[in-house]
Amino acid sequence: MPREIITIQVGQCGNQIGMEFWKQLCLEHGIGKDGLLEDFATQGGDRKDVFFYQADDQHFIPRSLLIDLEPRVINGIQNSEYRNLYNHENIFVAEHGGGAGNNWASGYHQGEQVVDDIMDMVDREADGSDSLEGFVLCHSIAGGTGSGMGSYLLETLNDRYSKKLVQTYSVFPNQMETSDVVVQPYNSLLTLKRLTLNADCVVVLDNTALNRIAVERLHLSNPTFAQTNSLVSTVMSASTTTLRYPGYMNNDLVGLLASLIPTPRCHFLMTGYTPLTVERQVNMIRKTTVLDVMRRLLQTKNVMVSSYARTKEASQAKYISILNIIQGEVDPTQVHESLQRIRERKLVNFIDWAPASIQVALSRKSPYVQTTHRVSGLMLANHTSIRHLFGKCLGQYEKLRKKQAFLDNYRKFPMFADNDLSEFDESREIIESLVDEYKACESPDYIKWGMEDPGEANVAADLDSKLVV
């Protein structure tokens, strides 16, 4: 029986990466732009109903909600070739259509006002599922709608569907460029608090690293949003292949996440992918072997999160867990040999307090998508260096907060009324504690860390109840 997953796309960024994700899924399952199965798509063996369901006229509809507070991106989707793919009852655009003005507090407040309409859609999708496993939220943490409204929805989902898994694909802003969103550090910090407390797994998509990969690996001098979004959709579709082309293991979300997240707070994952899709435009075909793919996945230049660590700190960072999803014609003995070579060469630095092993899931490739490479791989990794990304967010927040800059934008909303800025302070404390915990993971004594904090035990018990298969 399939374990269905409902995708919720919030804000401009969430809907753009969501759109690319559905295009990719349609290609891989032989589904046309109108949702009808292509004539050649007869081979089967895939599970379409994890992400799609069939209407009475047999066309496939994504289990997806498209939500935004301003109409531009969703209008673009409704006027695109894929306009007949979605269920139009699952599209929500705010009546006044003014957006959230890149303000977290505005997005959160508007989320409170329209939550009943949105949860009606969620409930309808959930009721249409035989065995709902959880939700996937696509959003960005820097703007207003994806961050603020996304935060409110995370809290509500956690409250109403407490036994269901919530995974997010969260886009972090480009830290190397000056942002046009001056309050980005505030928005990011407030969203990070909810991602820490209300999500079971966060796949971090770091725009800094995505841009770097597009420039260095794909030789694009000035990558567009569409090009970085296609990298994101590659990662999203690859991370769900074992759910859609099931094997003996890792064929549901719980199975995927259980080995990656040993402790409840440290649930932020980084990704790596090879060989990259757009590389084919550079007319470069190379021999791909399992060892080659697995070795490349461990190279920092292929990891889609920038480490802001200094050299000494970087050398102390360790992997908590790794899952490699290998697609293509692969013999399990090749996997075994590759793991042995990686171990012999000491290519991976694991933590001392848990089993040090790379998990490998083998998955079939879609028969409908032609690729020039025989083997491709996605790495999902829990790595302690991610704390430097959060440290960077904290540093930028502190700079703004010291100057009391732009706080009036937030004081207009109920949560920050009467100059009550405790929400900022609480968010900062939670993220500082998260950074400390990831740092503590590097030490062999981590198991004793945080024992004096009774709150930790409650969070752990909550996640454990969801991870009971």
Swiss-Prot record:
Name the Gene Ontology biological process terms: cytoplasmic microtubule organization; meiotic spindle organization; microtubule nucleation; mitotic cell cycle; mitotic sister chromatid segregation; mitotic spindle organization
InterPro entries per record: Gamma_tubulin, Tub_FtsZ_C, Tubulin, Tubulin/FtsZ-like_C, Tubulin/FtsZ_2-layer-sand-dom, Tubulin/FtsZ_GTPase_sf, Tubulin_C, Tubulin_CS
Q: Where in the cell is it found?
A: Cytoplasm, Cytoskeleton, Microtubule organizing center
Q: Which GO terms describe its molecular function?
A: GTP binding; microtubule nucleator activity
Arranged from A to Z, the UniProt key words for this protein are: Cytoplasm, Cytoskeleton, GTP-binding, Microtubule, Nucleotide-binding
- Major location category of this protein: cytoplasm
Question: Matching Pfam families, A to Z?
Answer: Tubulin, Tubulin_C
**Which domain of life does the UniProt lineage start with?**
Eukaryota
GO cellular component annotations of the record: cytoplasm; gamma-tubulin ring complex; microtubule; nucleus; spindle
PROSITE patterns found in the cross-reference section: TUBULIN
The residues that the entry says bind GTP are: 142-148
> What protein family does this chain belong to?
Belongs to the tubulin family.
**Role:** Tubulin is the major constituent of microtubules. The gamma chain is found at microtubule organizing centers (MTOC) such as the spindle poles, suggesting that it is involved in the minus-end nucleation of microtubule assembly.
This chain belongs to which protein, by name?
A: Tubulin gamma-2 chain
Organism per entry: Zea mays
